[in-house]
UniProtKB/Swiss-Prot annotation:
Keyword Manganese part of the UniProt annotation: no
Species of the source: Bradyrhizobium sp. (strain ORS 278)
GO CC terms in record: cytosolic small ribosomal subunit
PROSITE patterns from the UniProt entry: RIBOSOMAL_S15 (PS00362)
Lineage of origin: Bacteria, Pseudomonadati, Pseudomonadota, Alphaproteobacteria, Hyphomicrobiales
Domain of life: Bacteria
Name of this chain's protein: Small ribosomal subunit protein uS15
């Protein structure tokens, strides 16, 4: 349930803070959110897939850590990111 290289490039372009930016928290959270959304769709039809569920929980935890970092360092960017990706907090 991974995302294609083209889709990943679109996400990076839409969320990059400058040219060539692939490591900023905004880009990382956007990519993780896309992967999480893909996996939640997978679980609607494969409810007993516990191995993938563990991977989903790991992705959510990683995204949560990045969001905590962003909130600690720049709350305005944090709030904008939550709003842009419709992430509940």
């Amino acid at each position: 349930m991974s995302i294609t290289a083209e889709r990943k490039a679109e996400i990076i372009k839409a969320n990059a803070t400058k040219a060539g930016d692939t490591g900023s928290p905004e880009v990382q959270v956007a990519i993780l959110s896309e992967r999480i959304n893909n996996l939640t769709g997978h679980f609607k039809t494969h409810g007993k897939d516990n191995h993938s569920r563990r991977g989903l929980l790991k992705l959510v935890s990683t995204r949560r850590s990045l969001l905590d970092y962003l909130k600690k360092n720049d709350e305005a960017r944090y709030k904008a990111l939550l709003e842009k990706h419709n992430i509940r907090r």
